[in-house]
Structure formats: structure tokens, C-alpha cells
Amino acid sequence: MAPSRGLQPLHFSEGFSRCRSTLQHQSRNARPLQWSLHARRTYWSFTENLSNPSNKLQSYVSRSSDPYLNLSIEDHILRKSPPDSTILFLYVNRPCVVIGRNQNPWSEVNLSILNAATGTTDLKDTEPPGIGAVELVRRRSGGGAVFHDEGNLNWSITCPRTEFTRDKHAEMVVRALRKQGIERARVNERHDIVLDQGHERRPSDPNDMHRTPYTVDDGVPKPLKVSGSAYKLTRQRALHHATTLLESPNLHIISQYLRSPAKHSIEAKGVESVSSPVSNIGLDLKAYQKRLQDVFATMYANVGKISVTATVDDEYLNIPDIRKGYDELRVRLFNLSVSVHL
């Protein structure tokens, strides 16, 4: 696809007008609440299992590709699960740009491309990549801006706050990758998962999740990032979630969405993203998803067996608490220019 042409720095008055237009477009397309007997049964089954103190280990996979819904289910898990439980949640979103709670979308995202692709503005000087509408979503955790699509598996762990470290579950993911034959995978000093690009194979400890036979200490060639994470802490709980670039068909255009033409003309507070070269891992998503579930079960085998293994889907939007979070994400996204309190 051709890159954007002739983009001008965004002015806030113009930008807010576009945001209102985008918000109206999103509101018109929001799905209605359908509170049926089946939905009530779904609610009680899911929430009862989730909040049951005897269910120390749980594993869920989403069949929905709605980023607002998946993030709202994730938040529901964080707030409703028992304080001493550990829960794995896996999901894949349709194409979207997800920014952190404390980020300024004007300096992190090419809003002109997003608005042109959704048809909310008529920008004749902007040519979006030809993959259709790409939504902008603000998550409740911190961290930087990322691109999601059908080739990216998102993993989420909710656990007791006292057991949380930024490396613990990143190392779990690396173990799963290595079991799939990806021996270059490791956790770096920023707690991201990267693929080492060294040419010479050296001896290394296979149990060390922070070095590989191809780790280069002088940083050349640079490793390629395949997973970036963020987290949210509450009084008793911790949520740690991340992307995993497995087989994204849009790797070549991600930078067009995550590079704002207004970045250098805006002076505002907010967390800036750290740009890194990225790569696909080259694994089948379904096969790796199963492997990750198995590694999670092995990692927590001392706690017991996973007592709940289930799928969630679009009907979970009918759960009032999830619907409330869903509506909050859609409405608040364009409400502030820098960051929000969620």
C-alpha cells in the first residue's frame, strides 16, 4: 500500500471535531443489549464459576474478535475472580490500535488514517492501507500503543498481586514458544519477548528464559520484538496481558498506524511508546494457543488442576457488568486528549 501523502499536523479543534464524528459513528454501530433467559443463565454460570473460591485455576478462550468486549471480559475477570486465584484468558481481536490508559492518542496514533478508513472524515490527502476499518481502543492498563489483528494472540493472566512480577508469565510464554521449536525466543530487559538474530550458535542454559544460543551482547544484530506487555494492579489482584505476533498479515503496515504526523507538534503529558523492530514468530495460532494452555497448567500444577476451562463469546456482552465496561471503553476513548482514569 502507498504511504500517507501530504499529512499535516493535527490541530486540537479539528481533532476533537473528528473524534465527535467517530464517536457518533461508533455509537450507531454499538450492539443492543439483549437480556434473555439464556443470557441470564450464561451470566450466572460464568460469574458463579469465575467467583467461586474453590476455583483456584481457570482458563478461558474468547470466540469473539470484538476488542471492546474482550477487554471488558478481561476487566470483569480481574474484579470478580477470587483474590487467590490465577486465571488465563486468551483472545484474538479484529484489526485495531490499542493504546495505554496514560497515552495521548494524538501523539501516538495516525488518527487521520483511522478516520479516513472508517469513513468518519473525508480526507482526500490521506490514503489508508487497504485493510478496511481499524478501530482505536483505549485499554485500562498502562503501556504503549500496539496493533492487533487476526494473526496476533493476546494472552492475559490475572493473579494475586503478591505473586506478580513482570517476568513471571513472560517466561511462561517463552517456555511455550521454545516447546514449539522457537529457540531464539527470550525475555529482554524491558520484559518484552524478542527473537534473537545472532548468527553464531553458542552454548546456553535451556532453562534460562533471558538468554538463547543466539543472544548477542553488543546488541548487533538487534533482536526482533514479538510480544509487548502491560499490567494493571488493584489492592489484591494483578492483571498482566500482552500481544504475541504469530502470523500477522499486516506486519508491513503496522508502522503507518502507530506513527503520528502530529507527534512533534504536540506538547502534552502522557506515556510515549518505545518503537522497536518487530517480527512474526511463524506459528499456527490454534496450535500455539493449545500449547500455551498446557504450559500454564504445568506451571501451576502444584496448585492443582484447572477447575474451569471454557469459551466465551459475543453473548457475554449481555452480562450487565461486562456491558457497562464495554460502553465505558467506547465512550471514553475520545473524551480526553492525553489520558483517562478507568
Residue map of PLM features:
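N-terminal lobe of the biotin/lipoate ligase/transferase fold
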Residues: 2-167
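Long, positively charged amphipathic alpha-helical accessory segments at protein N-termini or as interdomain linkers
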Residues: 3-4, 76, 171-185, 202-342
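A short, structural micro-pattern
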Residues: 91-93, 130, 147-149, 187, ...
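FAD-binding core of FAD-dependent oxidoreductases
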Residues: 139-154, 190-198, 225, 231-239, ...
